[in-house]
Amino acid sequence: MNATFRPKPAGSRWTDEQWKAIAAGGRDILVAAAAGSGKTAVLVERIIQKVTAEEGAVDIDRLLVVTFTNAAAAEMKARIGEALERELANRPHSLHLRRQLSLLNRASISTLHSFCLDVIRKYYYLLDLDPSFRIADETEIELLKEDVLEELLEEEYGKADNERFFAVVDAYTGDRSDAELQEMILALYEFSRSHPAPDEWLADLVSMYDVDEQTNVETLPPARYIAQHAAMELAAAKRFIGLALALAEKESGPKPYEKRLREDMDLIADLERRLSGSWDELYHALQSLSFGRLPPCRGDGFDAELIDEAKSLRDQAKKKIEALRDNVFSLHPSAWLRHMREMKPVVETIAALVRRFSAMFEAAKREKGIVDFSDLEHYCLRILRQYDPETGEWQPSSAALEYQAQFDEVLVDEYQDTNLVQETILQLVKKGSERTGNLFMVGDVKQSIYRFRLAEPMLFLDKYKRFTADGEAGGMKIDLASNFRSRAEVLDGTNFLFAQIMGEAVGEMVYDEAAQLKYGADYPEGTDAVPEVMIIDRQRTSEEDEEETAELEAAELESRLMAEKIKEIVSRPFYVYDRSSGQQRRAMYRDIVVLVRSMTNAPQMIEQLQAQGIPAAADLSSGYFQATEISVMLSLLKVIDNPYQDIPLAAVLRSPLFRFDENELAMIRLSDPKGTFFEALQAFCQKTAETGEEENAKEKAISFLNKLEEWRTMARRRSLADLIWQLYRDTQFYDFVGALPGGKQRQANLRALYDRARQYESTSFRGLFRFLRFIERLQERGDDLGAARPLGDQEDVVRVMTIHSSKGLEFPIVFLVGLARPFYTRDLHSPYLLDKELGFAARFVHPRLRISYPTLPLLAIQVKKRLELLAEEMRILYVALTRAKEKLYLLASVNDADKEIEKWKGVAAESGWLLPDDVRASARSYLDWIGRALIRHRDGRSLVEVNRPDEIASHPSVWRFEIVSAAKLRNAEVSTDREDGGALVALEQGRPVPTQGEWEEEARRRLLWRYRYGKETVVRAKQSVSELKEQQALFGEQADEWLPRKGTAPLFSRPRFMQEKTLTPAEKGTALHVVMRHLDLHAPMDESSIRSQIIRLVEKELLSAEQAETVDAAAIVAFFATDIGRRLCAAREVYREVPFSLGLPADELYGSEGMESGRRLLVQGVVDCVFADERGYVVIDYKTDEVTGRFAGQKEEATRFLLGRYGGQMRLYRRAIEQIWRVPVAECYLYSFDGEYFLAVE
């Protein structure tokens, strides 16, 4: 089947590649969209093109659109809705477009979890699942896991002849608890859920350990990764020897070394040959390995530096090979096999425990009628596929075939972040093969940074390698390389780095021409957009500065350097391009973001920036449990649960709640030195006081014990949330913390604790003890309850955020800091590791000697996981660099800059763009990659003079380097203090603060400034017609509700106890409107019939009995006795209570003064009635204002009042109907029920 492709319209704003992604079809399509390439816009346009095509258009509910987040789904729906509205404006009579707008809200545009939930709701009976199930809160799931796991282990401990289980417990738990085993079971369970068939995957774990003495180690799955690692290390050793040989061959080089170095080269070649053969031979070759001594270089013709460098290179080669000998190949292959055989029962036992836990956990969830997010995917999978015993394969079920028939195309956003389960679901609901399919995937594998959530970027990469540009062999791939976000300097710099560091062996993909970012924006010239690399050297200080410099953390040093640069940016000033105005403007603090790998040091960074006068903030969700007010309340709750806890009890007594001082606590302890502190407290209360000080302390202690008993009783009888709020009231702690610095945040923290308690009790769990245990579990895992403070886009502050949080965002100026911080590799050294392919691996623990050894699978997974970690870190670095629109700063702090540069020099002369695999694989930080790449650039000459390949040195990118000493940063801080000192002294002495003229003038300008568009500050972007009416008049049918009068000013709707009294005019008017909306127009219009219909509205609870009594049936009869009333009953089309939204120029509603030019407001309203007959469309609005009494029967005065009050409103109604419905309104009327007459509105 050939790929379908619609030609690009003339004058289209889309690039050729973008249009191809929009218009291509007929097969599975993978769009590799680089950062800033407009992938979301392309995806939305593809959907719009499909549903708005004049030929072959599809309904939007025949598309399945899968997004990564709910926010992305909402945004996509909004964009599609706006596009449909625009298209409808061009084709107002298109019923198809109107239908798409009506279908949009129920279209399948959602996260995959939401789609799975819809599938389960529809086919729950296939799972024997209670249809009233609910999605459990994370708290409830964690507590239920804990319960099930405890139950499982108790059963195992109680079994007789359970030797294998106890062997596992002895091997993998400590002496005091089995927490390590619990963590292992939960980790393996969670990991298994990322597989489409978790039970089968768990059962298959043992197969890798099914070996015997005759097995060849080199044929086992782990051996492939060990061999790849060994080959990389041998290649590195060969490279070092080659460099040493090149030095020996130089005119003044160590020529006597040449023979020995060639022997070394032969030795390495022999090891490489053996690596691809028998590992038995390789083992013996490595164990018998011996490097000969280098011969001496006698005489004066040798360069000492070249001799030392050659020796160093050979030593590096020797270390590589010796590391292989002493680690990977330290055991004979037969020993590896023996360990694997002995591990087999261990793996079988652990896998069986996890499978039992899985079954028990699912049963517990079913019993409670709950599911978790993992269940959504797996239950959906059970519905969509069925096992075929004849072929031994899974096939789409009848439900899956229904979805295949339902959806004309399946579109997936952020495809690089899908996992194997999600991929399986997508494959089941799509049609056909890759060559004939309807799966459209868009993403950027270089931005796949969620492997820790078990995302699988290899799914994207595998397709990218298989698919072709023309799609003839199968699926089609389309590269979107044009970046419309960043300046050319940022893109060139990013390309220069990644062309050198990202490769297939280390990085999982090649950063080739197709992957490189291409400049597609249209920035004006004149901005200094050169990326800057700033390295803080801690050792470049004078002797007396060493102690202070050593105390400064890297984050603080980098923050001080950032502060200097940010001050320059704002004051110099630095200009950024504002796309909304199309003009350059001065950079503001909000244009700047600081990106960090983790938020560990973010509070210190913010503190440093603020100390330098720079407003800075972060969405911090950590530090909640460390907050004083939360620590105190949790201690109090622990004491209420169990007062025999010394530390919480002492913390509560010492806290502001009870204010015991150190002397009083000492008195209490002396009352019973050996018992618990609570026992000492009880003894102290029974003791006779000997001094006034003791008497005072005793009164406080007795008061505390009385309160504690009261609270303990309350904890048994009332809800947890009630208890916590009562504690706030009894102790007045909530009010107390509100008066402290940061009081609002502290009170918000206490409210969050209360809310969390309520949330906890909404689950199937209860009780203070369980809640405290849950909190402890959160703290043990490093989780936090703190809600991040959302920052508005317009807050003029420097933002500090993680690279992960920045994904999908863009900022004019980016500071990427902490580049020398080591990668987090601690997980690689865990006693056990998990891998989708290699399964489960752990250290072998000798049952008698209690000595542990790494097993071959464990080593293999370590090697594999390290490469995966490095690939992930490369992608995270790519995301960070591509957030910058105009300026990029890279910051690092190192112990010795000279030593770092010396390390980088080793690769400066390497030929070819890609740095050697071993160099990239040995990186311990981002700086290790960046430094080695940039040293090869021509601008690296400012750091060191070395030979550089011309092709690389002449790259069009431009860089600026700066080495900054820590002493300079410290001195800068001192000088700042001195500048402020004069002002501080003046203030202390009560004298005027000396100011410079320009600052005084600036202060005056700011204080006297008035906002140009002041009127806009009191005008909302969305206005109802009623609000517009009330802003233009002082009384009407709702006057009693809003008009301030002497003695009363109702602000809220009336409470229930007042509703027994007489209804207000507005409430009576509302009741009449309800009747007019629901009247049967084909029924007789007499009082009896209308009364009967009103009674039915009361029975349907659309009206209260009190409201019904106020409705004047005779007035309604009078309305329908008119000519227009009769026309309404006979009309071919009748619409009642018609809502509308209409965008209008603000100056048209409020006048141009005080309003921004071009500002539009959204006006909303509801038209009481619209009908159409042979004369055209008629608009009617009912009014219940009292006019007969007010104007003493003077109809002309009443008419003038009503038209003056409501004429503008009616003209808006007419305009809305005409613009939105695209039909002319022939007649427009007000009807006054009080006067029983119509008023025509022109």
Curated annotation (Swiss-Prot):
<keyword id="KW-0234">DNA repair</keyword>
<comment type="subunit">
    <text>Heterodimer of AddA and AddB/RexB.</text>
</comment>
<dbReference type="GO" id="GO:0000724">
    <property type="term" value="P:double-strand break repair via homologous recombination"/>
</dbReference>
<keyword id="KW-0238">DNA-binding</keyword>
<dbReference type="GO" id="GO:0016887">
    <property type="term" value="F:ATP hydrolysis activity"/>
</dbReference>
<keyword id="KW-0378">Hydrolase</keyword>
<keyword id="KW-0269">Exonuclease</keyword>
<feature type="domain" description="UvrD-like helicase C-terminal">
    <location>
        <begin position="514"/>
        <end position="808"/>
    </location>
</feature>
<feature type="binding site">
    <location>
        <begin position="33"/>
        <end position="40"/>
    </location>
    <ligand>
        <name>ATP</name>
    </ligand>
</feature>
<dbReference type="InterPro" id="IPR027417">
    <property type="entry name" value="P-loop_NTPase"/>
</dbReference>
<comment type="function">
    <text>The heterodimer acts as both an ATP-dependent DNA helicase and an ATP-dependent, dual-direction single-stranded exonuclease. Recognizes the chi site generating a DNA molecule suitable for the initiation of homologous recombination. The AddA nuclease domain is required for chi fragment generation; this subunit has the helicase and 3' -&gt; 5' nuclease activities.</text>
</comment>
<keyword id="KW-0347">Helicase</keyword>
<dbReference type="InterPro" id="IPR011604">
    <property type="entry name" value="PDDEXK-like_dom_sf"/>
</dbReference>
<keyword id="KW-0413">Isomerase</keyword>
<dbReference type="InterPro" id="IPR014016">
    <property type="entry name" value="UvrD-like_ATP-bd"/>
</dbReference>
<feature type="domain" description="UvrD-like helicase ATP-binding">
    <location>
        <begin position="12"/>
        <end position="487"/>
    </location>
</feature>
<protein>
    <recommendedName>
        <fullName>ATP-dependent helicase/nuclease subunit A</fullName>
        <ecNumber>3.1.-.-</ecNumber>
        <ecNumber>5.6.2.4</ecNumber>
    </recommendedName>
</protein>
<dbReference type="InterPro" id="IPR000212">
    <property type="entry name" value="DNA_helicase_UvrD/REP"/>
</dbReference>
<dbReference type="GO" id="GO:0043138">
    <property type="term" value="F:3'-5' DNA helicase activity"/>
</dbReference>
<keyword id="KW-0067">ATP-binding</keyword>
<keyword id="KW-0227">DNA damage</keyword>
<dbReference type="GO" id="GO:0008408">
    <property type="term" value="F:3'-5' exonuclease activity"/>
</dbReference>
<dbReference type="InterPro" id="IPR014017">
    <property type="entry name" value="DNA_helicase_UvrD-like_C"/>
</dbReference>
<dbReference type="GO" id="GO:0033202">
    <property type="term" value="C:DNA helicase complex"/>
</dbReference>
<dbReference type="GO" id="GO:0003690">
    <property type="term" value="F:double-stranded DNA binding"/>
</dbReference>
<dbReference type="GO" id="GO:0005524">
    <property type="term" value="F:ATP binding"/>
</dbReference>
<dbReference type="InterPro" id="IPR011335">
    <property type="entry name" value="Restrct_endonuc-II-like"/>
</dbReference>
<comment type="similarity">
    <text>Belongs to the helicase family. AddA subfamily.</text>
</comment>
<dbReference type="Pfam" id="PF00580">
    <property type="entry name" value="UvrD-helicase"/>
</dbReference>
<keyword id="KW-0547">Nucleotide-binding</keyword>
<dbReference type="InterPro" id="IPR038726">
    <property type="entry name" value="PDDEXK_AddAB-type"/>
</dbReference>
<dbReference type="InterPro" id="IPR014152">
    <property type="entry name" value="AddA"/>
</dbReference>
<keyword id="KW-0540">Nuclease</keyword>
<dbReference type="GO" id="GO:0005829">
    <property type="term" value="C:cytosol"/>
</dbReference>
<dbReference type="Pfam" id="PF13361">
    <property type="entry name" value="UvrD_C"/>
</dbReference>
<dbReference type="Pfam" id="PF12705">
    <property type="entry name" value="PDDEXK_1"/>
</dbReference>
